[in-house]
Amino acid sequence: MEKMKFDTLISSDLGRARETAAVIAEFTGHSIETDSRLRERNYGVLEGLTISEIKAAHSDVLKRLDANDPDYVIPGGESHRQHYNRNIALINELQSGHPGARVALVAHGGVLDSLFRYVANLPLHQPRCYITTNASLTVITRGTFYGTLRWVIETWCDSAHLDGIGQNFGLG
């Protein structure tokens, strides 16, 4: 990111993202704004449990999640649609409030999923067909491409800067 120019640095207010944002800010000199809309999806009763514990205690919830119903609200948590709407509300606010600004966001895999679906116009019920990588770099640009103003994914989950130090691949 040393060579990337941006105007604003916004991070999820959760610890892992704030720590990553602090490393970026140290190199770039930016101050860090936080926004809770960049938080990962709230998994309610499933938070902090292993997959074995979820299968044992909440198999009904797991079945509902596996059905990919975007409106299913996890007990004590939120639905995929609620999470998506929260993420995209911030993107739309940034776009209208800071036109032309280059914004660096430090977030979580589920937020990347929301952005990918938004840009690619993928329905929320469709299972993921892509991987998100921790500590990776994604570049999404809004501009005129082939005569149409739209969002374009320029770089997706680039982790070349992690070569040689190990990587943690995951789905969210």
What residues fall within each predicted segment?
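Acidic, low-complexity terminal tails and accessory targeting/binding regions
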Residues: 41-53, 96, 101, 117-172
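GST superfamily/GST-like fold recognition
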Residues: 109-113, 136
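Glycine-rich phosphate-binding loop signature in dinucleotide/nucleotide-binding domains
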Residues: 1-5, 94-101
